[in-house]
Amino acid sequence: MDIEAFDYHLPEALIAQTPLKNRDESRLLILGRQSGYIEHKHFKDVTDYLNEGDTLVLNDTRVMPARLFGMKEETGAKVEMLMLTQIEGNDWEVLLKPAKRIKVGNKLTFGEGKIIAECIEELDQGGRIMRLHYDGILQERLDELGEMPLPPYIKERLDDQERYQTVYAKASGSAAAPTAGLHFTDELLERIKAQGVNIAFITLHVGLGTFRPVSVDNIDDHEMHSEYYQMDEATANLLNSTRDNGNRIISVGTTSTRTLETIMQSSDRFVAKSGWTDIFIFPGFNFKAIDGLITNFHLPKSTLVMLVSAFSSRDYIINAYNQAVASEYRFFSFGDAMLII
């Protein structure tokens, strides 16, 4: 398929620059997966569309303050490093800016030497594998020196760093938030549980793919970047019993969706599993895991627009996006949401 099929016009003014005061007061577009039917609600109304016995699957990853500003040890030249994925031990895949002059063997220093990063492998498009040297616990060094890695389309400074975390964020390791989850409050989750809906958690650490646009004209030629995921036995058992009882599995976000569908590609039942996934979901994909999807509005021509188009249809999704634009919904990470069901 041609990538232009997943384009739509978005006025820049509709890109949300800051979160709303109250998470669950964002707008919610309801889209009938099979019919294309559209309804306009608010996120706190999501309870009207969840049934007793359904299971809501959330990604409990936590965003690291993974943007570091430092200098090249040899020259003192300024450099920015965005930590993306832990490869093994202290070796991390990162994005550097500028990257051109950072070669294997070069060292970068951050916080007057509190973190030193040595380049051990050069990748394309500004990517590098860096070996980190530091005293103590890395998370503590990042909390001290790092900044939250907001997407490039957000120009405003974030006053409260926790607003780029879900209220249930737990497992540190992401370079970006699973943004569909940003709309939930503790109170809303309690209301959902009170009506007999199950809450389940998986983990997928959001990595490089979030920051890289599709660079091919034919989407069949696109290759996804790998991201680490895990699901425990308790969650697998809950999802299997949900399915056995004839109830629905509602995925919160494309990251939860990619995790669940990865696991179900090699099995007819949910199983406890961890590993790396590069699953690319686009129209024609056979969904085996989910019955509904809560997701934000995504960038034109992105793999995430392709994923939601696969779950519903390209025509229904583009029509819904165009209606959202006409209704002045807020787009992207701090924007509004849609429920496809």
Swiss-Prot record:
It is an enzyme of class 2 (transferase). Gene3D superfamilies: QueA-like (3.40.1780.10). Keywords: Cytoplasm, Queuosine biosynthesis, S-adenosyl-L-methionine, Transferase. It is found in: Cytoplasm. Its EC number is 2.4.99.17. It catalyses: 7-aminomethyl-7-carbaguanosine(34) in tRNA + S-adenosyl-L-methionine = epoxyqueuosine(34) in tRNA + adenine + L-methionine + 2 H(+). It comes from the Bacteria. Transfers and isomerizes the ribose moiety from AdoMet to the 7-aminomethyl group of 7-deazaguanine (preQ1-tRNA) to give epoxyqueuosine (oQ-tRNA). Belongs to the QueA family. PANTHER family: S-ADENOSYLMETHIONINE:TRNA RIBOSYLTRANSFERASE-ISOMERASE (PTHR30307:SF0). This is S-adenosylmethionine:tRNA ribosyltransferase-isomerase. Pathway: tRNA modification; tRNA-queuosine biosynthesis. GO terms for biological process: queuosine biosynthetic process; tRNA wobble guanine modification.
